[in-house]
UniProtKB/Swiss-Prot annotation:
The cyanobacterial PSI reaction center is composed of one copy each of PsaA,B,C,D,E,F,I,J,K,L,M and X, and forms trimeric complexes. Apoprotein for the two 4Fe-4S centers FA and FB of photosystem I (PSI); essential for photochemical activity. FB is the terminal electron acceptor of PSI, donating electrons to ferredoxin. The C-terminus interacts with PsaA/B/D and helps assemble the protein into the PSI complex. Required for binding of PsaD and PsaE to PSI. PSI is a plastocyanin/cytochrome c6-ferredoxin oxidoreductase, converting photonic excitation into a charge separation, which transfers an electron from the donor P700 chlorophyll pair to the spectroscopically characterized acceptors A0, A1, FX, FA and FB in turn. It is an enzyme of class 1 (oxidoreductase). One of its GO terms (biological process) is photosynthetic electron transport in photosystem I. NCBIfam families: PS_I_psaC. GO terms for cellular component: photosystem I; plasma membrane-derived thylakoid membrane. Its cofactor is [4Fe-4S] cluster. Transmembrane segments: none annotated. This is Photosystem I iron-sulfur center. It is found in: Cellular thylakoid membrane.
Amino acid sequence: MSHSVKIYDTCIGCTQCVRACPLDVLEMVPWDGCKAGQIASSPRTEDCVGCKRCETACPTDFLSIRVYLGDETTRSMGLAY
């Protein structure tokens, strides 16, 4: 089953999500949008098992990273009924 990982611009570059991911789906890449100068990226979403440990580890008030599991992706986009 395919999962979608979305990184929002509220990411503060803390690396908590990257360290929490047991399958190294995430990595940090350079970004000028925060003090840390980096943002999480999800180049290997095909390896995501949907454990959502990255979401749990995110310290921002608005989760900067979200994992949408299979059909949940289309529901969240209003494409499923």
